[in-house]
């Protein structure tokens, strides 16, 4: 633990990590003033960080332009892009790991499958290529908030994403990939081990005695599951940002 950097905190050996969508913000929407104030209070007591599957630009939209200064740790794409006290750490690349030939086969299968799904609505950006993963959305990431809510209800009834994931697992069993359903409208595809637990390697040297994690998709198959059940963390399952504030207030006497 670096005394000089974190000694001012009441609990410098405690780290609290947060998922973004559904935990700090409503899905794809911006953070509320109540959550911001709660996090500011919490940061005086212990170290805080966020870890999400989206790239940093989307997290800046949701959490604000000063997010790198307001969190001790900032983990985009599950920690493949990482910042500690505003300074960038080493990153990884999905395409370099998988290779162009395999990625082409994967992308062609995904696009063909997307074209054959029976859906009431389609919008745009069905396959999003990121540094550390790809994100697949049957309705498309350009869907409005209302359309996202509609798809989420439709998906719960028809299991569109779950069936899609099973088809991918069957088609590419030897690719070493993980398929993780998260948010309302999409799922992530990334190398095994590149889930949210990936970010924990960035904090190992700081010697935290307690690492708490707050997330909403903590069920098996959800994109918070692996870090939620990891033996290195104390997991907290939440239903909404309001729920996050409530638990934090009680747990840390804010």
Swiss-Prot record:
InterPro entries: HAD-like_sf (IPR036412), HAD-SF_hydro_IIB (IPR006379), HAD_sf (IPR023214), PMM (IPR005002), PMM_cap (IPR043169). Keywords: Cytoplasm, Isomerase, Magnesium, Metal-binding, Phosphoprotein. The keyword Isomerase applies. CDD domains: HAD_PMM. Mg(2+) 1 binds at residues 19, 21, 216. Its EC number is 5.4.2.8. It is found in: Cytoplasm. Mg(2+) 2 binds at residues 228, 230, 233. Alpha-D-mannose 1-phosphate binds at residues 28, 130, 141, 148, 186, 188. The modification Phosphoserine is found at residue 240. Belongs to the eukaryotic PMM family. Present with 3500 molecules/cell in log phase SD medium. NCBIfam families: HAD-SF-IIB. This is Phosphomannomutase.
């Amino acid at each position: 633990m670096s005394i000089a950097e974190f000694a001012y905190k009441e609990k410098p050996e405690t780290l609290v990590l947060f998922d973004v969508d559904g935990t700090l913000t409503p899905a794809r929407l911006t953070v509320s003033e109540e959550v911001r104030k709660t996090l500011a209070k919490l940061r005086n007591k212990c170290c805080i960080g966020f870890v999400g599957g989206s790239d940093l630009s989307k997290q800046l939209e949701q959490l604000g332009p000063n997010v790198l200064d307001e969190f001790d740790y900032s983990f985009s794409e599950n920690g493949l892009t990482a910042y500690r006290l505003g300074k960038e750490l080493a990153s990884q690349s999905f395409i370099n790991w998988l290779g162009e030939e395999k990625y082409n086969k994967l992308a062609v299968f995904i696009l063909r499958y997307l074209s054959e799904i029976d859906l009431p609505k389609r919008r745009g950006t069905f396959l999003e290529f990121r540094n550390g993963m790809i994100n697949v959305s049957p309705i498309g990431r350009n869907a409005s908030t209302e359309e996202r809510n509609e798809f989420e209800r439709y998906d719960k009834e028809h299991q569109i994403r779950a069936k899609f994931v099973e088809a991918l697992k069957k088609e590419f069993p030897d690719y070493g990939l993980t398929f993780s359903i998260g948010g309302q409208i999409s799922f992530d595809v990334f190398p095994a081990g590149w889930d949210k637990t990936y970010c924990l390697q960035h904090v190992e040297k700081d010697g935290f005695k307690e690492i708490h994690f707050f997330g909403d998709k903590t069920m098996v198959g959800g994109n918070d599951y692996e870090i939620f059940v990891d033996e290195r963390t104390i997991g907290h399952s939440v239903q909404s940002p309001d729920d996050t504030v409530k638990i934090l207030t009680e747990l840390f006497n804010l």
